């Protein structure tokens, strides 16, 4: 069985995990971007009161 036949028969089994990994990577990068914005935002700049939970998690 050649590599071309293997890819032709099992392309779904190759592309679905690759798509999941790529989506996971993009989601993590987007979270980093939003976290950087949150840390600079005027809304979240105040000091938290004692025993107060953060509003973002």
From Swiss-Prot:
Annotated GO CC locations: mitochondrial inner membrane; nuclear speck; respiratory chain complex I
UniProt KW Methyltransferase keyword: no
Cell location: Mitochondrion inner membrane
Membrane topology: Single-pass membrane protein
Source domain of life: Eukaryota
Keyword ATP-binding: no
Coiled coil, from the record: none
Keywords: Electron transport, Membrane, Mitochondrion, Mitochondrion inner membrane, Respiratory chain, Transmembrane, Transmembrane helix, Transport
InterPro entries cross-referenced by the UniProt entry: NDUB1
Transmembrane segments: 10-26
Summary of the function given for this chain in its UniProt record: Accessory subunit of the mitochondrial membrane respiratory chain NADH dehydrogenase (Complex I) that is believed not to be involved in catalysis. Complex I functions in the transfer of electrons from NADH to the respiratory chain. The immediate electron acceptor for the enzyme is believed to be ubiquinone.
Quaternary structure and interacting proteins, as annotated: Complex I is composed of 45 different subunits.
Similarity comment: family membership: Belongs to the complex I NDUFB1 subunit family.
Name of protein: NADH dehydrogenase [ubiquinone] 1 beta subcomplex subunit 1
């Amino acid at each position: 069985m050649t590599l071309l036949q293997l890819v032709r028969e099992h392309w779904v089994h190759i592309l679905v995990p690759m798509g999941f990994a790529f989506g996971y990577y993009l989601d993590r990068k987007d979270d980093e971007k939003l976290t950087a914005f949150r840390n600079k935002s005027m809304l979240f700049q105040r000091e938290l009161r004692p025993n107060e939970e953060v509003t973002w998690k």
